[in-house]
Amino acid sequence: MKRGRFLAPLLVFLIVAGFLAVGLNRNPRELPSPLIGKTAPEFSAETVGSPEKVFSPSQMVGKVWLLNVWASWCVSCRTEHPMLMKFAQQRIAPVVGLNYKDKEGDGAQWLQRHGDPYIVSVFDPEGRIGIDYGVYGVPETFVIDTKGVIKLRHAGPITQELLDERITPLIKKLNGQ
């Protein structure tokens, strides 16, 4: 009887310690996404700076591409912007922007001021497209394959290390290089 009184708290402690150990070993930048391995959500939206033009992910079928979620008010987006500019100049894969929860005109002005790495950037003022993609915040980047399937999701600013070690090798693999 006395033995059971001591074993129960010990067992509870070991279970809690196990969950804690698993949690501490996870990368906080890698938020789980149920969309990995699934077709990217379809949408049709006006483009930043050219509302008469409309973009849909179905236009990218047959290409490996990046979807980068950004906003003019996002400080981290400014941090990653030089990396996106460099990546776009290398023409490794087309980059599509998703201007998330911004005011009309702010995104276009921001791109004019800082440079435009996107083949097109769509306007998502209410964040509905972002919700469909499970966006937690900005910036976020998705790698989407030739069939429109999401292969990678990265929350946070893109770094040179991330481009060199994960994104570019994945794109080359998906392109059969």
Each language-model region and where it sits:
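N-terminal targeting signals for export/organelle localization
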Residues: M1-E46, Q177
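Thiol/disulfide oxidoreductase modules built on the thioredoxin-like
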Residues: F6, Q112-P117, D124-N175
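Short gly/ser/thr-rich secondary-structure transition/capping motifs
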Residues: N25-N27, E46-E52, S121-D124
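Short pre-active-site segment immediately N-terminal to redox-active cysteine/selenocysteine motifs
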Residues: T39, K63-W65, V69-W73, G137
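A generic structural signal for alpha->beta connector loops
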Residues: E42, I92-A93, Y118-I119
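A short beta-strand-turn-helix
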Residues: F43-L66
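Hydrophobic beta-strand core positions in alpha/beta domains
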Residues: L66-N68, G97, V143
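Structural microenvironment flanking redox-active thiols in thiol-disulfide oxidoreductases
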Residues: R78-G115, P125-I131
